[in-house]
Amino acid sequence: MTFSVDKVRADFPVLSREVNGLPLAYLDSAASAQKPSQVIDAEAEFYRHGYAAVHRGIHTLSAQATEKMENVRKRASLFINARSAEELVFVRGTTEGINLVANSWGNSNVRAGDNIIISQMEHHANIVPWQMLCARVGAELRVIPLNPDGTLQLETLPTLFDEKTRLLAITHVSNVLGTENPLAEMITLAHQHGAKVLVDGAQAVMHHPVDVQALDCDFYVFSGHKLYGPTGIGILYVKEALLQEMPPWEGGGSMIATVSLSEGTTWTKAPWRFEAGTPNTGGIIGLGAALEYVSALGLNNIAEYEQNLMHYALSQLESVPDLTLYGPQNRLGVIAFNLGKHHAYDVGSFLDNYGIAVRTGHHCAMPLMAYYNVPAMCRASLAMYNTHEEVDRLVTGLQRIHRLLG
């Protein structure tokens, strides 16, 4: 199948609107991607004609809704090549998935004197839950440092592992720098030391195929809203043997086998014991439509188009005076930058006046900002619906801002 960015853009209604009298150039998909009509329509159709509570009724609507929900679990398992759909837990997003692991697996397996390894490039969602866990149990948090080019100092990694290392929690792709970490060698090293590995895949799954069996990671988590799906839904993958041993971290309906006031409560099997309460069924249906949409386009086709666009953007940005780029030359999805000594918020505001949407701030990565000694950065993210013309508009906008502000 030949990838056509024009055909893709036609599927996204918001891309036809104007901002400040100019065509919208949406360069903020790493924060949250826009939604194609196929996703919007699938969720709307479910609420119009198919809605019912799942797992709780024998009537037709409930049975059909349950089947649709479980079919999305199967589709998601194929999307990341899990061995079984029962290795996937529906969560609100990457943040909840990581917190689930920290509070369930972490509370059961990390003790005083143990250690957990993260990196200096992590999103706060892959830092704070581990800080909280370490504070609860008296464990140590160790950090893989950054290089100036935005890669990790991997030569330090073997020195961080010891017999007390319980987990390596690492991002697949940095949400600020676009760095893709060499997961295969990192996971192999962790397993050699008896540690488990959690991968934050929030910035990876939309850019190229992910195979959790080939990676051999123990946990993999991602959000739907960055993958052209709805907000409030994501996927946590856990190897089946681990998942079946993990205790629930939230109690309520759907996650129980029996409840007795005199004899206590027993849990249902995983993954359902981690899905207490009424799920975001509409979001799940929308996620299924997003997975179907992306799969039909072909992730390899998307990857090829996006990489060509990224190479073009990096080359064109060289023409902008006083522009500082952060991150390696080979990157996925994002370009973080600052213009001279101007604050990122000011630059982002000017770009918005030109109809260009970029993200500004610390990007939930304050330790990374501290490493580069800046309070904030601008971040332009490139998705499958972005164009060379939009890159040109970004470059022209930055050149214009430089002329105006000096």
Curated annotation (Swiss-Prot):
Cellular component terms (Gene Ontology): cytoplasm
Single GO MF descriptor: selenocysteine lyase activity
Chain ranges passing through the membrane: none
Reactions that this protein is recorded to catalyse: (sulfur carrier)-H + L-cysteine = (sulfur carrier)-SH + L-alanine; L-selenocysteine + AH2 = hydrogenselenide + L-alanine + A + H(+)
Enzyme active site: 364 (cysteine persulfide intermediate)
EC number: 2.8.1.7, 4.4.1.16
Entry keyword Transcription: no
Residues found modified as N6-(pyridoxal phosphate)lysine: 226
Alphabetical keyword list: Cytoplasm, Lyase, Pyridoxal phosphate, Transferase
Cofactors that this protein relies on: pyridoxal 5'-phosphate
Major place of residence: cytoplasm
Pathway: Cofactor biosynthesis; iron-sulfur cluster biosynthesis
Localization of this protein: Cytoplasm
InterPro entries hit by this protein: Aminotrans_V_dom, Aminotrans_V_PyrdxlP_BS, Cys_dSase_SufS, PyrdxlP-dep_Trfase, PyrdxlP-dep_Trfase_major, PyrdxlP-dep_Trfase_small
CDD domains: SufS_like (cd06453)
UniProt GO BP: cysteine metabolic process
Subunit and partners: Homodimer. Interacts with SufE and the SufBCD complex composed of SufB, SufC and SufD. The interaction with SufE is required to mediate the direct transfer of the sulfur atom from the S-sulfanylcysteine.
Purpose of the protein: Cysteine desulfurases mobilize the sulfur from L-cysteine to yield L-alanine, an essential step in sulfur metabolism for biosynthesis of a variety of sulfur-containing biomolecules. Component of the suf operon, which is activated and required under specific conditions such as oxidative stress and iron limitation. Acts as a potent selenocysteine lyase in vitro, that mobilizes selenium from L-selenocysteine. Selenocysteine lyase activity is however unsure in vivo.
Family assignment from sequence similarity: Belongs to the class-V pyridoxal-phosphate-dependent aminotransferase family. Csd subfamily.
Protein name stated in the entry: Cysteine desulfurase
